[in-house]
Amino acid sequence: MPSVSVWVRSLAPMTTWTRAAIGALGEDLAVKHLDSLGMRVLERNWRCRYGELDVIAEDPAARAVVFVEVKTRTTDHFGGVAEAVTPQKVRRLRRLAGLWLAGRDERWAAVRIDVIGVRIGRQATPEITHLTGVA
């Protein structure tokens, strides 16, 4: 498979993309980033009646389960990654993480919530910002 930058450059112009397609691309790039860090993705787009968790991964180095919120941007109009995660969003992520954990037999030494921001379109290569342990 070609590198991420070649793959992204070969896609159609961003102006023709739907929000869902841009979000899916951002999640794919976030998963590749997590893989490069040695993390193992357990689930993607886990849903329940209270919402959705974008990516659930295991960080073997920290013996932690990591709930990852992915924010994909094509402009800076909506602020950066840190501004995208409000206290209300953190509360929702914690609640969803608790529900996901309640349905599992496996236990981890730690639970963490990370945010990955993916900025597409400003440069030839997507910009990835990974904030660890936001909650």
Curated annotation (Swiss-Prot):
It comes from the Bacteria. It holds the Pfam family UPF0102. GO terms for molecular function: nucleic acid binding. InterPro entries: Restrct_endonuc-II-like, tRNA_endonuc-like_dom_sf, UPF0102_YraN-like. Coiled coil: none annotated. Transmembrane segments: none annotated. PANTHER family: UPF0102 PROTEIN YRAN. Belongs to the UPF0102 family. NCBIfam families: PRK12497.1-3 (NF009150), PRK12497.3-1 (NF009153), PRK12497.3-3 (NF009154). This is UPF0102 protein Mkms_2031. It comes from Mycobacterium sp. (strain KMS). The lineage of its organism: Bacteria, Bacillati, Actinomycetota, Actinomycetes, Mycobacteriales.
